[in-house]
Amino acid sequence: MKGLELSRKFYETYGASMLHEKFPELEDKLAIGLVGDGSECFGYDDDISRDHDFEPGFCIFVPDDIDSRTEFQLERAYAKLPKSFEGVDRLKISPVGGSRHGVIKTGDFYLAKTGSRTGFDSIDQWMTTPDSCLAAATNGEVFRDDLGEFSRIRQSFLDMPQDVRLKKLAGHLIMAAQAGQYNFKRCISHGETGGAQLAMIEFADHAMSAVFLLNRKYRPFYKWAFRAMRELEKLSGLADTFEFLISSDNEPVTASAKADIVEDIASMIITELQKQSLTDAICGDLEKHAYSVNDRISSTQLRTMHIMAGV
């Protein structure tokens, strides 16, 4: 059983009745779910994931103005829930960084993930918050939220402004062009195979980020990036190709093939840019398309920032 399903079942079996019986006046002010750090929040957990920080548990997101006495009573009631469920024991010690389950103030949760308690109100906040943090703030599942405040903030983080999306996309495109379409071949010509591999890793990193932005999805922490990419609607088939590019050698025959693959990937990304009417450039150079994407930004302030300001 996956961690997300385990969490929901634990809540439905024990948590829901506990809250209804012991906190009836508070029940409709809480948001319940599993959101945040950990592979189980993304649905990526497996048997290996159970060797650390894995337990039956759920989050009780409470209003920021909850009184300390009620918060303490909630914490005690949650702690008294069964110590084992479906053959999985609850953790006796909180993981590094604090408990991922139990009673959490809504504002504290979002502040820890994004730097904001209630949602972003400036472009600067959007531009300086890593997509992996936004992924962790908006993953998982909300089982119940009668008040709707937790879900309102969650949705606000899911709705990245188009100008921000374009600025980040332009930055990743130009970085991908620099690393993959230019520096990789330069390094190979100089006999710098290590440098060539670093260039290819940079290309894959930025091109993958561009693919996530084209899908309007947040790219998660790097160790889950390939897993998440394979689930995307658009260009998900490139995941295996990127994996080959960063894991293969740079002997002459392979390096030549990799350079061709880079151009193929660029062509596929450009086609998607054109489908979404994000570029007017007519060429195979990702750098030129990056500037064309940047030209579509409506905010003069954001458009005139350095093209790499979003990466």
Model-predicted regions and their roles:
Residues S68-I188:
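Conserved NTP/Mg2+-binding pocket subregion across the NTase superfamily
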Residues M1-S17:
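N-terminal regions immediately upstream of nucleotidyltransferase
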Residues M1-K2, I66-F72, V262:
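Basic, alpha-helical terminal appendages of large translation-related enzymes
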Residues L19-D65:
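Active-site nucleotide-donor binding segment shared across nucleotidyl transfer reactions
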Residues S132-R303, M308-G310:
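Conserved nucleotidyltransferase catalytic core and NTase-mimicking acidic/glycine-rich helix/loop elements
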Residues G15-F23, L74, Y78-P82, I269, ...:
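Hydrophobic, Leu/Ile/Phe/Ala-enriched alpha-helical segments that form helix-helix packing faces
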Residues M1-L6, K105-T106, F221, G237:
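Secondary-structure junction/capping motif
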